[in-house]
Design a protein with these regions (language model features):
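A short, well-ordered alpha-helix in the C-terminal region of glycosyltransferases
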Residues: 120, 127-141
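C-terminal alpha-helical cap of glycosyltransferases
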Residues: 144-159
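Short acidic/histidine- and often glycine-rich active-site loop of Leloir-type glycosyltransferases
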Residues: 77, 90-101, 105-106
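A conserved nucleotide-sugar
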Residues: 3-44
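Conserved acidic donor-binding segment of nucleotide-sugar-dependent glycosyltransferases
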Residues: 99-111, 120-125
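Short acidic alpha-helix that forms the nucleotide-activated donor recognition element
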Residues: 28, 44, 50-59, 80, ...
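Aromatic "clamp/platform" in nucleotide-sugar-dependent glycosyltransferases that forms part
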Residues: 48, 67
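Short hydrophobic beta-strand element within catalytic cores of glycosyltransferases
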Residues: 84-87
Length: 159
């Protein structure tokens, strides 16, 4: 679905690059889809990386196009890094990004939804800044000191 959305954007002359990190059973499928759609100048399969943070840190935006997720560790890592995030509406994402998408851009769980999210970010640079700030705000929920203060405050409120 990500490749289909990217193919549509490329046909519209949008300028972007996608770097996919990781290994998995879909690799051959992805390679053939990239080749079939003539996307090898736009989409790069980087394979397993011992330290993916180097790549994530230089990314303008993080995209999770999953059909289904449990708790998405990689999406939470993107939030902690303050990356603007485009994620599909699947289990776990609203818990991570807020019910109303306060900390990330939650799209419809479809090719069109992924396309729509990417298109909006490509056409509106201000969204990158806005959602980077939202991600940084969301990352505070993972700060141990803030979590301890919240727990302490909640415990004291009971007395």
């Amino acid at each position: 679905r990500l490749i289909d959305a990217a193919t549509k954007l490329k046909k519209e002359n949008a300028k972007f690059k996608i770097y996919i990190i990781g290994e998995g059973p879909e690799k051959k499928n992805l390679e053939s889809q990239i080749e079939k759609n003539n996307m090898s100048d736009v989409i790069y399969l980087l394979g397993f990386k011992k330290n993916p943070y180097v790549y994530m840190n230089f990314a303008d935006v993080f995209i999770c196009s999953s059909r289904a997720e449990g708790f998405s560790t990689v999406a939470s890592e993107a939030v902690v890094l303050g990356k603007p995030c485009i994620v599909t509406d699947c289990s776990g994402m609203r818990e991570l990004f807020g019910e109303e998408g306060q900390y990330g851009f939650i799209t419809e769980n479809s090719t069109e939804g992924i396309y729509d999210g990417m298109d909006k970010f490509i056409k509106n640079n201000k969204m990158l800044t806005e959602y980077a700030e939202r991600a940084k705000e969301g990352a505070k929920r993972f700060d141990v000191n803030i979590a301890l203060k919240t727990i302490e405050r909640n415990l004291l409120d009971d007395f």
